[in-house]
Structures are given as structure tokens and as C-alpha cells.
Amino acid sequence: MIFKQLIELYDLLDSPSASGAQVVDYLRSIDPACDAETYVLEGPKGSTDMVRVRIPGSRGRTAGGDAPTIGLLGRLGGLGARPERIGFVSDGDGALCALACAAKLLSMHARGDVLPGDVFVSTHVCPHAPTFPHEPVAFMGSPGPRPR
């Protein structure tokens, strides 16, 4: 089950100071050798921390094999819309689920349960996403650049 990882990451992400660095530190507490990185992506309405994790497979490209690679993308506007909306908001579920999957796969990998193919997980951590007016509730935006 993935409940432990969901609860731990929810606790980590439900904070106005949540960051990509905190997420990477959490993932490295599970597997110190994990391939995880974070970087800041600046946009017209602020910034967000991008997080990328690679879990190598036993026969994946990382190991020189031919097993298929899968990518999990946690899409969202942001974890929070502070100060307009206090606390973790529903747009954060994409990041939470993607990162919980990464944490579970890293835990399995560290214990010897290795999937055949590589798994990539990517999302962003933004506790202060911009909003724009909409009734009855404002819509979430994203500080990053718009997709082309």
C-alpha cells in the first residue's frame, strides 16, 4: 500500500514553506542514492520548484536494457493559493500522487523489488500559486510559463 508515503508527503507539502528541496531530501531519506533533482522555474507570475526523479529498472535504459520506460507527470496549478486560499488545495493532488508513487517505488527499489523498466516522475511544488477570479471559487493558475 502507498498510504504511508501519501500521508508523509501530504504533511510535507501542506505548508506555506513547502519546496522542491524538502521533497528531494524526503526522497533521499528513503533511498540515499536516488536520482532526484529540483530546480526553480521562473514565470511571469512567480516561480515554482520543479522536481524530477528517476527510478532505474533492472532492464531499463539506465542499465543498458530494452525494457519500456514509463513517465508519471503530476499536473497541477499549485499546492496552495496563499493568501487567498489557506492550506493544501485540490489542485495539489497531482503532485501529491506523483511524488507518493516515486516514494513507494524508491522504497521498493531499496528493498530489492525492482521493476523491469525505468520510471521517471516529474511535477512541480508551488505553495503560493496565483489565482484568477471565477465564481463561486477562484481558479488556480501557475506561475510558470504557459505551454506552447
Language-model segments: what does each one mean?
Residues K4-R82:
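Soluble metallo-hydrolase cores and metallopeptidase-like ectodomains found primarily
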Residues L76-L79, T123-P130:
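Acidic, glycine-rich active-site loops and adjacent beta-strand->loop/helix elements
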Residues E84, P130-V137:
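Short acidic, glycine/serine/threonine-rich loops at helix termini
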Residues P16-V23, D91-A95, G144:
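Generic structural signal for well-ordered, non-membrane alpha-helical segments
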Residues V23-D31, C101-H109, P147-R148:
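Hydrophobic, Leu/Ile/Phe/Ala-enriched alpha-helical segments that form helix-helix packing faces
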Residues P136-R148:
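A glycine-rich helix N-cap at a beta->alpha junction
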Residues P44-K45, R59-D66, V89-D91, R111-L115, ...:
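Solvent-exposed alpha-helices and their adjacent loops that cap or buttress functional pockets
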Residues L72, R82-T123:
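Alpha-helical metal-binding/catalytic segments enriched in His/Glu/Asp
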